[in-house]
Swiss-Prot record:
GO biological process, one term: protein insertion into membrane
Lipid-substituted positions (N-palmitoyl cysteine): 20
Primary residence: membrane
Gene: bamB
Record keywords, A-Z: Cell outer membrane, Lipoprotein, Membrane, Palmitate, Signal
Signal peptide positions on this chain: 1-19
Keyword Protein transport recorded: no
Family matches, as NCBIfam families: assembly_YfgL, PRK11138.1
Family: Belongs to the BamB family.
Protein name as it appears in the record: Outer membrane protein assembly factor BamB
Gene Ontology CC, one term: cell outer membrane
Lipidation sites (S-diacylglycerol cysteine): 20
Lipid bilayer topology: Lipid-anchor
TM spans (from-to): none
Length: 392
């Protein structure tokens, strides 16, 4: 078992564990796989790179760039937000959300969830339980709202609402126009959970979200009423680690089917209307996954990259040469699957057979959040804050 991020009451630790017990002095040591040797079939190149503040350091974060109307929006943990020209990376505007703390110092904003762009606004959440809406034109704050807890997942905008899943198990809907809280749903919290929350998926007027209690919930967005809940991960085992049941990945809804993935649980297909389980496969992960056509692509909790069928979750291929390299979530780009790792490499994988087709050293600080593919561009932000635009 591999554990990347752990939340204990009053204590945040970024850990890498193996074995069955959190407190076992004889636990096995997890070793990162050596960098695989790859004969590049093409040469990925960096079109441009731009520094955005000090990045996230060694803190858990869900900050990654967003692209809209040929503008890249990115942020760092301290509170710097920048808009960049997507063609050359040149700065259009920058603002700081850090608060003044005396004459010469500022209190960092601790941005953690985002970036999301929609309807002329840039949305970002913080560990200080603040959600910001910035105007895309100049970065000025359109509104700022205090929510129920740390906003660790990215804001999701749908049907005039901004949906926020907080670290204390609350799903909140804010008015897109002014940030007013319209409703709050309690998703329950166990005593111990992984640090990080599922961002909701939206479909047919419902918000579908994973919870730290091992359940997937569907909520009526208009009124905040619970439609159904379904457990996909059961808290079992003799240790606290074994009993972690978080569903921190974002569900994917396709043709009336909800696909959800738990950490110590299952990849599960659920009926959107009833929540009933259609099929399940024993797999675990904290990384978001992809449903494309008749395939599911994912990175499991041990950093195996896998392709499975959408009907039944049958394994099509598995790439096991990146074990314990702390991979990002995958992204599809130009017909290949791309993942980043903690040493700053991008790995390009053939979607048909799982073989490597290219490898690229990009950044020495490493990657934690997934690449973003949009409008023919591949963007990724390193832990030190540098944003890269990659082409092949």
């Amino acid at each position: 078992m591999q554990l990347r991020k752990l939340l204990l009451p009053g204590l945040l630790s970024v850990t890498l564990l193996s074995g069955c017990s959190l407190f076992n002095s004889e636990e096995d040591v997890v070793k990162m796989s050596p960098l695989p040797t790859v004969e590049n079939q093409f040469t990925p190149t960096t079109a441009w790179s731009t520094s955005v503040g000090s990045g996230i350091g060694n803190f858990y974060s869900n900050l990654h760039p967003a692209l809209a109307d040929n503008v890249v929006y990115a942020a760092d943990r301290a509170g710097l937000v920048k808009a960049l020209n997507a063609d050359d990376g040149k700065e259009i505007w920058s603002v700081s959300l850090a608060e003044k703390d005396g004459w010469f110092s500022k209190e960092p904003a601790l941005l953690s969830g985002g970036v999301t762009v929609s309807g002329g606004h840039v949305y970002i959440g913080s560990e200080k339980a603040q959600v910001y809406a910035l105007n895309t034109s100049d970065g000025t704050v359109a509104w700022q709202t205090k929510v129920a807890g740390e906003a660790l997942s990215r804001p999701v905008v749908s049907d005039g609402l901004v949906l926020i899943h907080t670290s204390n198990g609350q799903l909140q809907a804010l008015n897109e126009a002014d940030g007013a809280v319209k409703w709050t749903v309690n998703l329950d919290m166990p005593s111990l959970s992984l640090r990080g929350e599922s961002a909701p998926a939206t479909a047919f007027g419902a918000a579908v979200v994973g919870g730290d209690n091992g359940r997937v919930s569907a909520v009526l967005m208009e009124q905040g009423q619970m439609i159904w809940q379904q457990r996909i991960s059961q808290a079992t085992g003799s240790t606290e680690i074994d009993r972690l049941s978080d569903v921190d990945t974002t569900p994917v809804v396709v043709n009336g089917v909800v696909f959800a993935l738990a950490y110590n649980g299952n990849l599960t297909a659920l009926d959107l209307r009833s929540g009933q389980i259609m099929w399940k496969r024993e797999l675990g992960s904290v990384n978001d996954f992809i449903v494309d056509g008749n395939r599911i692509y994912l990175v499991d909790q041990n950093d195996r990259v896998m392709a499975l069928t959408i009907d039944g979750g049958v394994t099509l291929w598995t790439q096991s040469d990146l074990l314990h390299r702390l991979l990002t979530s995958p992204v599809l780009y130009n017909g290949n699957l791309v993942v980043g790792d903690s040493e700053g490499y991008l790995h390009w994988i053939n979607v048909e057979d799982g073989r490597f087709v290219a490898q690229q050293k990009v950044d020495s600080s490493g990657f934690q959040t997934e690449p973003v593919a949009a409008d023919g561009k591949l963007l990724i932000q390193a832990k030190d804050g540098t944003v890269y635009s990659i082409t092949r």
